[in-house]
């Protein structure tokens, strides 16, 4: 427990809009370190020689006597800042990354027991291959039945991303450090609960800043999807091309069993991305300036895909 030493915490977790894939979550934790105890090269430190890379770190917030996990991962780097002057304090910044780093560092080839199976079963088979703990998984059954694993040399994260694209679902590390695999129907059908509503009208939850964007970042009007062993399935929207020029996107070697499934995925991508969209990039909250009890909860209780 090092809360009393912490001066700043920054957490970044989310999905890349261009690739439609979740990326590794990161966190920077800055500590006051006037004694040098958090300098990993200091032999006089009470923690020496145990300040090494990949030590586990858990970041949580407490509200109304309940703990809310914000990040669970591993310390990647210890950055020490030696500051001089009457008003300066030496600090150490712990640069952290979530379990995606471990998945990306675990090489696999043949996946045991991975014949024709549901996408969720394939996720579990890949995680079994690298001995990922059962207690750190939250895996949907999935809505697609996949081909047998190709058995190529790759890392576990690449294999999981292939399943994610084949399912047309989502896979990420949640704030508790669990691998979450969400099926495509769950992505569409499952509403977030509880619902937090934001407004600037003096009702609901107030915010200090909301960044709204309207651009072509997500625009794709020509889509080609190719399954492993299949032929490219292409769909396009000519009115969108005429209006916004050509924006092409491709996926290859997904593991669905038929060309019809690949075509259905291409049609789904085109339907949702052929036109520019208005989106909220960020909402900034000041958790101390409002009596609405849902405001702090909105700051600590919202998970990815909520």
Show the residue positions of the predicted features.
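Short, conserved helix/loop micro-motifs enriched in His/Cys and acidic residues
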Residues: 134-151
